[in-house]
């Protein structure tokens, strides 16, 4: 229930990093008091053919257990300005993220939560980096997104489409 009383102010002086002591947090951010910048795969890093891969909806799509249905290659989204975009994940004073979208020339910032048990990531006050022309593919670019792969050099996040094109 509700508790009524006079407001109280407090200041948080430090960041308890015990809950981010996991390899996945380190892969994503570079570790406590560090930050790491991520870029789109343009096909030259050896992990994907381009900025987007479609998962096979007839199979299981989860952490380290998914298969590509279609990997259309570089430029499939039709947004050639996307290649200078970045996502910076930081554990400096909190779990912070900064998204620079080179197509729109906009930077958004917020926080994120990495659920290492369920392999999901949630953004607050910003969205997962995506090409602006694809914003209508889903209403959810930020909550409980499926982390499919993550190591020190590459990351795949699954977004479930909720438009007329179907879920994957």
Region roles according to the model:
Residues 1-108, 115-168:
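Lipid interaction determinants
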């Amino acid at each position: 229930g509700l508790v009524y009383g006079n407001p109280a102010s407090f200041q948080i002086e430090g960041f308890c990093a015990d809950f981010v002591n996991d390899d996945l947090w380190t892969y994503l951010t570079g570790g406590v008091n560090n930050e790491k910048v991520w870029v789109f795969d343009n096909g030259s890093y050896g992990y994907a053919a381009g900025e987007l891969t479609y998962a096979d909806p007839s199979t299981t799509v989860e952490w380290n257990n998914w298969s590509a249905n279609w990997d259309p290659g570089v430029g499939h989204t039709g947004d050639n300005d996307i290649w200078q975009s970045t996502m910076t994940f930081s554990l400096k004073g909190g779990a912070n993220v900064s998204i620079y979208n080179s197509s729109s020339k906009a930077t958004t910032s917020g926080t994120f939560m990495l659920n290492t048990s369920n392999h999901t990531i949630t953004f607050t006050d910003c969205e997962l980096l995506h090409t602006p022309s694809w914003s209508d593919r889903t209403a959810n670019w930020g909550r409980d997104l499926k982390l499919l792969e993550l190591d020190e050099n590459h990351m795949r996040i699954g977004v479930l489409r909720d438009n007329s094109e179907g879920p994957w």
